[in-house]
Amino acid sequence: MISSLHRPTLAKVDLSAISENIEQVVSHIPKQVQTFAVVKANAYGHGAVEVAKHVSKQVDGFCVSNLDEALELRQAGIEQPILILGVVLPDGVPLAIQENISLTVASLEWLALAQKQGLDLTGLTCHIKVDSGMGRIGVRNLKDADNLIAGLKALGADVEGIFTHFATADEADDSKFKRQLSFFTDLVDNLTARPRLVHASNSATSIWHATTVFNTVRLGVVIYGLNPSGSVLELPYNIQPALSLETALIHVKTLPAGQEVGYGATYTTTAEEVIGTLPIGYADGWTRDLQGFHVIVDGQLCPIVGRVSMDQITVRLPKVYPLGTPVTLMGENGGASITATEVAEKRGTINYEVLCLLSDRVPRSYD
C-alpha cells in the first residue's frame, strides 16, 4: 500500500521514548537477564526496521511473528539474533539457516514432517514452545518436550531455547498465571537436556511479576509506552507513549440546526454548529466504532459526529478554525491528551490493536 505523503495525516514515532522505556523496564528486572525486543506486526505499528535499528545496542535480540518479518530485518542490516515466535513449516528451514534466523518448534508433528522431507537441520537454531495453558501452540508435557529436543538435535539443530507464554499476566487475578508458571517451571526443571535460554516473561510479566523471570525476557508493548493491561493494573513506574497520531482540518463549515451529517444520516445538528472535516478514516485504521469519540483541536476535545468514512471523519468544533489547523487523534495538544488505551476503551478492544491497525496509508515520521 502506498503511504499518503501528500495529506496532513501522520503518525509521529519518538524513538528516544522507546529507548527510555527499555531502560526503565530493564532497570526493574534481575541483572544478567537477556532482553529481546518484540518488533512483530511492524513493531506494533511503529515501524520494525526503524525501531530495531534504533534500539539494536540496547537489546540482545529481536522477536517477530513470521519469516517475512525476520527477513525484513535481515535485509535492513539487522545482525542481532532474531527469533520467530510463530510456527514456520519445515520448508522454510533452508532460508532460516541461510539468514541465521531462529525458529520456534512447537510439536512432534513438525519434527516428523522435517524427517519425512529428509531435512538436515545443521545450522538451524530453534526454541521449543511449551503450551502451559494458553492453548495455541506448543508441546504440553515433559515427554514430548524431551523427545522433541532429542529429535531436533539428532537432525543437527541447535536447540538454544525453550519458552512459554502467559495468558493472564496482565490481570488482577493471578491464579492462572501461577498455574502456568508452576507447570512451565516444573517441566523445565525436569528436562533431560535443558536449553541455554529459558523465557516466559512478556511485557506484563516483566512489569508485575519481575521476580519470576528466567534468564531471558521478551519486551513487547511496554517498550512502546503502553500499559499491557489497559487500565486494569497500575504501572509501578512511568513509561512514555512513543506514537502520536495527527492530522489537520481540510474543510470547515457552519451548518444550521436540523442538518444531517455523514453516511446513514446518523447525526443531526441540534443548533447552528461548526463542522470540521479531517482526512483520516477506517482505511487508515481509525475505525467506524469511533463515532462519538473525540479529537483535540486547539487544546479542546471535539466530538466525532456522523459515521467514520473510509477516508474522512467529521468533528464538531467550538468555533471556526482556519484550514490546516493541527488536530490530534492520539497524543497531546494544548494541555489535553488522548491515549491509545482511551481509544481502545471506546472501541471495546485493547491498546495493542489500536496501534497495529494503523495502516500503511499513514506515513510514520521519526524523532
From Swiss-Prot:
Catalytic residue positions: 40, 263
Lineage of producing organism: Bacteria, Bacillati, Bacillota, Bacilli, Lactobacillales
Similarity-based family: Belongs to the alanine racemase family.
Catalytic activity as recorded in UniProt: L-alanine = D-alanine
Cofactor: pyridoxal 5'-phosphate
Pathway given in the UniProt record: Amino-acid biosynthesis; D-alanine biosynthesis; D-alanine from L-alanine: step 1/1
Entry's Gene Ontology cellular component terms: cytosol
Transmembrane region(s): none
Organism: Streptococcus thermophilus (strain CNRZ 1066)
Biological role stated in the UniProt entry: Catalyzes the interconversion of L-alanine and D-alanine. May also act on other amino acids.
InterPro entries: Ala_racemase (IPR000821), Ala_racemase/Decarboxylase_C (IPR009006), Ala_racemase_C (IPR011079), Ala_racemase_N (IPR001608), Ala_racemase_pyridoxalP-BS (IPR020622), PLP-binding_barrel (IPR029066)
GO molecular function: alanine racemase activity; pyridoxal phosphate binding
Signal peptide: none
Binding positions for substrate per the UniProt entry: 136, 310
GO BP annotation list: D-alanine biosynthetic process; peptidoglycan biosynthetic process
Official protein name in the record: Alanine racemase
N6-(pyridoxal phosphate)lysine: residues bearing it: 40
UniProt KW keywords: Isomerase, Pyridoxal phosphate
Its EC number(s): 5.1.1.1
